[in-house]
Amino acid sequence: MTQIIDGKALAAKLQGQLAEKTAKLKEETALVPGLVVILVGDNPASQVYVRNKERSALAAGSRSEVVRVPETITQEELLDLIAKYNQDPAWHGILVQLPLPKHIDEEAVLLAIDPEKDVDGFHPLNMGRLWSGHPVMIPSTPAGIMEMFHEYGIDLEGKNAVVIGRSNIVGKPMAQLLLAKNATVTLTHSRTHNLAKVAAKADILVVAIGRAKFVTADFVKPGAVVIDVGMNRDENGKLCGDVDYEAVAPLASHITPVPGGVGPMTITMLMEQTYQAALRTLDRK
C-alpha cells in the first residue's frame, strides 16, 4: 500500500522543535535568529512565498523583516541594500526572492550575499562546500527532501536514485546529497534520451522539471519512492505537481502530494538554516 509522505505534518512537527530550540537559545544567550527577505517588485507568486516565510519565521520564534522594493530599483541600489544587511549582526539570514527583473544580474546579486548569511545556499562558495562534501548552507528544498527520507525511514544506501531536473536550486544539490548517502545517482533533464526508460530503473525518483504531470506511470517502477518538487497549474487551474499523481501513486511505495508535500518542508528548512547561522555567530565570538 502506498504511503503518502505528509510534508505539511512533518514541517509542523519540525517547526515545533525549532521553536523550542529558538526559545532555549534566546533564554541562554539572548540571541534571536533573524531572517531578512528582500522582495523586488510585486510578482504575485513571490508575494505568496514571502508571506509564507514570514508566518514560518514567526511560528519558529525567529525575527523576520520583509524589505519590499520597487521593480525599478537599480542593480547598484539592490547591492547596496544587501551590503547593509551583510554588515548588520542582528540579521543571520539574507534571502533575495527570485526571480528578479531582467535588468538585474541574478548572479551578481547572489554573489553579493555574505556566504555565512546565504540561507538559500545559492552562493558559489556554499555550492562548492556542498560538492566537496563539507556543506554549511544547503538549498532548502533538497534539504527538506533529505529530512523526509530520514523521518520516513527510507534507506538510500546502494539505491538507484534518478533526479529529473538539473537546476542549481534543486536538481544538482539533490544529486550531491543523495550521493553523500551512498545512493547511485543519475542526474537527468529534458534532453535526456529515453527519459522514461531511465527513470523506470529508479528506486528513488525526484522530479523537479517544472512541467505539469510530466511523469506518468511508465516512468515509475513498482515500489519506487517518488518525490514531486513541481508546483504547477493544470488545464483547469488546479495546483498540481510534475508527477501525474493519480496514475503514479498506486505504483509507488511512498509519494509526496502537491500541495502538502515538499513545499512546506522547504520553508521549514529555511528557518532551520537561519537558526544554524545564528548559532555559528556564537562560535565566532
Curated annotation (Swiss-Prot):
Pfam families: THF_DHG_CYH, THF_DHG_CYH_C
Pathway involvement of the protein, from the record: One-carbon metabolism; tetrahydrofolate interconversion
Annotated NADP(+) binding sites: 165-167, 190
Keyword Metal-binding: no
Keyword NADP among UniProt keywords: yes
Domain of life: Bacteria
EC number: 1.5.1.5, 3.5.4.9
A GO cellular component annotation in the UniProt record: cytosol
Alphabetical list of CDD domains matching this protein: NAD_bind_m-THF_DH_Cyclohyd
SUPFAM superfamilies tied to this protein: Aminoacid dehydrogenase-like, N-terminal domain, NAD(P)-binding Rossmann-fold domains
Listed GO MF terms: methenyltetrahydrofolate cyclohydrolase activity; methylenetetrahydrofolate dehydrogenase (NADP+) activity
Keyword terms, alphabetized: Amino-acid biosynthesis, Histidine biosynthesis, Hydrolase, Methionine biosynthesis, Multifunctional enzyme, NADP, One-carbon metabolism, Oxidoreductase, Purine biosynthesis
GO biological process terms held by the UniProt record: L-histidine biosynthetic process; methionine biosynthetic process; purine nucleotide biosynthetic process; tetrahydrofolate interconversion
InterPro entries per record: Aminoacid_DH-like_N_sf, NAD(P)-bd_dom_sf, THF_DH/CycHdrlase, THF_DH/CycHdrlase_cat_dom, THF_DH/CycHdrlase_CS, THF_DH/CycHdrlase_NAD-bd_dom
Coiled coil: none
Reactions listed under catalytic activity: (6R)-5,10-methylene-5,6,7,8-tetrahydrofolate + NADP(+) = (6R)-5,10-methenyltetrahydrofolate + NADPH; (6R)-5,10-methenyltetrahydrofolate + H2O = (6R)-10-formyltetrahydrofolate + H(+)
Role description: Catalyzes the oxidation of 5,10-methylenetetrahydrofolate to 5,10-methenyltetrahydrofolate and then the hydrolysis of 5,10-methenyltetrahydrofolate to 10-formyltetrahydrofolate.
UniProt cross-references to HAMAP family, sorted A to Z: THF_DHG_CYH
Subunit note: Homodimer.
PANTHER family in alphabetical order: C-1-TETRAHYDROFOLATE SYNTHASE, CYTOPLASMIC, C-1-TETRAHYDROFOLATE SYNTHASE, CYTOPLASMIC-RELATED
Homology family: Belongs to the tetrahydrofolate dehydrogenase/cyclohydrolase family.
Protein's recorded name: Bifunctional protein FolD
UniProt source species: Streptococcus pneumoniae serotype 2 (strain D39 / NCTC 7466)
Origin organism lineage: Bacteria, Bacillati, Bacillota, Bacilli, Lactobacillales
Originating gene: folD
